[in-house]
Amino acid sequence: MSRHVAIVTDSTAYLPARAMERHGITAVPLTVVLGDRALEEGTEISTRSLAQALQKRRPVTTSRPNPELFAETYRRIAESGADGIVSLHLSAELSGTHDAAVVAAREAPVPVRVVDTGMIAMALGFCALAAAETAEAGGTVDEAVTAAEKRAAGTSAYFYVDTLDYLRRGGRIGAAQALFGSALAVKPLLQLEGGRIEPLEKVRTASKAIARLEEIAADRAGGAPVDIAVHHLAAPDRASALADRLRDRVPGLADLHVSEVGAVIGAHTGPGLLGVVVSSR
C-alpha cells in the first residue's frame, strides 16, 4: 500500500485555487480583526472591504489561527488516509502561526512536520507547491520538507509600498524606519530577509520605485529557470503592467502568477502594494 503525504499551509500563501485543488493542498486561514469583528481570511473579508477600512483609518489587526483549528485540520487529513503531514507556514518572525501549528502537531494522529519557511505570500506558496509535487511523486515527509526548504533557499521577495505607516502600526518594521520612509515623499522598496521585512532602497517617486522593483526582480531572475509571482493590493493595473514587462525581460521564466494579496498581508502593507516573488526552479 502506497504512503500518502499531505501538504498543509496557511492562507497567506495566496496560492491560486486551481493549484491548491490540483495538488491537494490545504490552507488554514489566519484572522483579520476589523473593529470588533474577527473574520477569516479568504472567506469572510474581501480585499476591497479591507482597502476601504484602511483608507478610512479604521482599526485593523491580524491574528494567528487557533491551535485547535490546526488540530481539526490534521485530524481530518489523517482520517482521509494520509500517513504523514508537512505543514508549511509564513515566517515565524512575522506571525505566531508556526507556533500554533507546532502545538497542534503534538497531538496529531499521524506524524506532522511543521516548517517555518521564513517566507510569505507566493514565496510561501512556491514552497508548498514544491513539497506537494514531491509528495505526489511518492516522496516521504522528509523528502517533501527538503524540497520546500530548497525552494525557500532559492526564493526572493521584493515589495513596493506607498507608505511604511501600516507596517509600523503592525510592528513589522521599526518606527524610525517608518518615519524615514514617510519623509520627503520617499517611496520605500523592501525585501524579505531572514524572515523579516527589511528596507532595501529608497526612491523618490512611485514610478521610479516601480521601475526599480522591476529591475531588481529581473536581475535576480537572471537567465536561469524561475517562477515569478506579482502581488498587489488595490493596484491591478500596475500589477498587470509589471507582469507584462517581466515576461519580456526574464528569458528563463517558467510560470508567472498575478494575484491580489489577501487581507492579512494587506492589513500590514496598505493599498498600493506591489510585490514580486522570484523563485528558482
Curated annotation (Swiss-Prot):
Where does the DegV domain lie?
A: 5-280
Q: Where does hexadecanoate bind?
A: T62, S95
This protein's source sits in the domain of life called: Bacteria
Q: Indicate whether Chloroplast appears among the record's keywords.
A: no
Question: PROSITE patterns of this UniProt entry?
Answer: DEGV
A Gene Ontology molecular function term for this protein is: lipid binding
Q: Give UniProt keywords alphabetically.
A: Lipid-binding
Does this UniProt record's set of keywords contain Cytoplasm?
no
* SUPFAM superfamilies associated with the record: DAK1/DegV-like
Q: NCBIfam families of this UniProt entry?
A: DegV
Question: What is the annotated role of this protein in its UniProt record?
Answer: May bind long-chain fatty acids, such as palmitate, and may play a role in lipid transport or fatty acid metabolism.
PANTHER family attached to this UniProt entry: DEGV DOMAIN-CONTAINING PROTEIN DR_1986-RELATED, FATTY ACID-BINDING PROTEIN TM_1468
The name this protein carries in UniProt is DegV domain-containing protein SCO2569
Q: Which organism is it from?
A: Streptomyces coelicolor (strain ATCC BAA-471 / A3(2) / M145)
